């Protein structure tokens, strides 16, 4: 496909407040995943992946355990998924995924992020068609052809594979996440995955420069401050 996938990982939270927000987001997501699919990670693969991801992001064990206990204890909040789409400052496409126990509040909070930065919130489907919902795996390596052949031998469906600066990136349909991960583990038992996630990969990028770049960063910062926002996907290409 000739796409260049840039993984933008936020640096480790530098303030206690930022860390608490990360813990809260993971706690909410783990709670809902366990409540809907069961609290046993061996029986709920989505939960198993989520817990693994939380540990990689240095979420403390007590935060994870509390979310699991809450899910098995009955009662508790009933969060719903909410997705908002639109165009960020500079015209970049954006998808905002939330978990909320009050849809009206969340919509107003997210809407203010758009309004105060000159962005435009749209209707469902406004931006989603500009992304591919994919499973992405990234790890160190130098022979993408060998990896592709190994995955094909395991009957894993791969849509693209790239090699850049000693890093291999594998793209697959989002429904193939666990199959591809299992195939990689079978073929390369000692492989360390630097990235393993289901995400929205932009089909193309929109350059965002100058004042728009400043507004775009403010837009992201405001969304990050929203307690109900879980993930933000965009296709902005910012200057270094």
From Swiss-Prot:
Keywords, comma-separated and alphabetical: Cytoplasm, DNA-binding, Transcription, Transcription regulation
Molecular function, one GO term: DNA binding
Localization: Cytoplasm
Listed SUPFAM superfamilies: YebC-like
Pfam families cross-referenced by the UniProt entry: TACO1_YebC_N, Transcrip_reg
Predominant cellular place of this UniProt entry's protein: cytoplasm
Gene Ontology, cellular component aspect: cytosol
Annotated GO biological process: regulation of DNA-templated transcription
PANTHER family: TRANSLATIONAL ACTIVATOR OF CYTOCHROME C OXIDASE 1
Homology family: Belongs to the TACO1 family.
Protein name (record): Probable transcriptional regulatory protein VF_A0150
């Amino acid at each position: 496909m000739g796409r260049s996938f840039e993984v933008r990982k936020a640096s480790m939270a530098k303030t206690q407040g930022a860390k608490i927000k990360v813990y809260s987001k993971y706690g909410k997501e783990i709670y809902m995943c366990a409540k809907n699919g069961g609290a046993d990670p061996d029986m709920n693969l989505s939960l198993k992946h989520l817990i693994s991801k939380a540990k990689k992001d240095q979420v403390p064990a007590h935060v994870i355990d509390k979310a699991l206990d809450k899910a098995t204890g009955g009662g508790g909040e009933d969060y719903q998924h909410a997705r908002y789409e639109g165009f960020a400052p500079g015209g970049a496409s954006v998808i905002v995924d939330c978990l909320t126990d009050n849809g009206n509040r969340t919509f107003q909070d997210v809407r203010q992020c758009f309004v105060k930065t000159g962005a435009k919130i749209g209707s469902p489907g406004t931006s989603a068609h500009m992304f591919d919902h994919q499973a992405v795996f990234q790890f160190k390596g130098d022979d993408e052809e060998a990896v592709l052949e190994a995955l094909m031998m395991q009957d894993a469906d791969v849509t693209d594979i790239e090699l850049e600066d000693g890093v291999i990136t594998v793209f697959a349909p989002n429904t193939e996440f666990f199959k591809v991960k299992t195939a990689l583990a079978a073929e390369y038992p000692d492989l360390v995955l630097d990235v393993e996630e289901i995400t929205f990969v932009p089909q193309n990028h929109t350059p965002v420069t100058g004042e728009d770049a400043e507004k775009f960063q403010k837009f992201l910062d405001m969304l990050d401050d929203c307690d109900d926002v879980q993930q933000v996907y965009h296709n902005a290409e910012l200057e270094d």
